[in-house]
Amino acid sequence: YDASGIGSNFDIRQIPLDNVERIEILKGSQSTLYGSDAIAGVIHIVTRKAGNKPFMLSGQASYGSYNSLRTNAAISGRVKEVEYNAGYGLFNTHGISEAIAPAGVTNRFDNDGYRQDNAQASMGFRLAEGIRINPYIRYSKIKGELDQQGFVDETDYSYMAKNTQAGIRNEVQMDKLKLNLLYNYNYIDRSFLDDSTGSRNGYYTFSHAQY
């Protein structure tokens, strides 16, 4: 059962924070530059770019409450007219229960875990004076567990969401005029599974959506 349905809105959870350089908030109408959906404003998320050295390596790891593990690693660099950037990130936690046990219930609700994998790669090429192309690809996979509602535990209710993005950007600088040509492919695959007798209808429940 997918309570949220599926649409063209991007799931912001699938952008790993370790790959974000900065976030800009643009208030007011920005339709001229960003399209008709930007009538009230834009949240502009700028991802990290390649460094100025031929090879750079970065990474980090942390561990916290509820067996939460967060790791990421990235390589980037620039060699003459070519730049590259690639990285992988993982977040995994045993989590807490999505549901709250009502008064009088002594059984401990099971924890609802969560795991997210992210991978991305991009390159930049300078073809000629004022002309650049930037191909990129991003992949994200999220797996998690849910409960039925606020006060009802559910041990076999899970979901998975996968997102693949790929595209290419062409920049042409002509004196004071800058032309950007962008192609982007976005594929979303989500599934929800509840195979316990405690499901909403007492039977096996499955929902699968692609966009």
Question: What is the predicted role of each segment?
Answer:
Residues 8, 13, 32, 64, ...:
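Alpha-helix initiation/capping motif
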Residues 58-62, 85-89, 124, 136-138, ...:
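Transmembrane beta-strands of outer-membrane beta-barrel proteins
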Residues 1-27:
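Short acidic/polar hinge/loop motifs at secondary-structure boundaries
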Residues 5-7, 19-21, 32-44, 49-98, ...:
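Outer-membrane beta-barrel translocator/receptor signature
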Residues 93-100, 106-118, 126-179, 185-208:
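Flexible loop and strand-edge segments within Gram-negative outer membrane beta-barrel domains
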Residues 26, 46, 74-78, 87, ...:
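Transmembrane beta-barrel domains of outer membrane proteins
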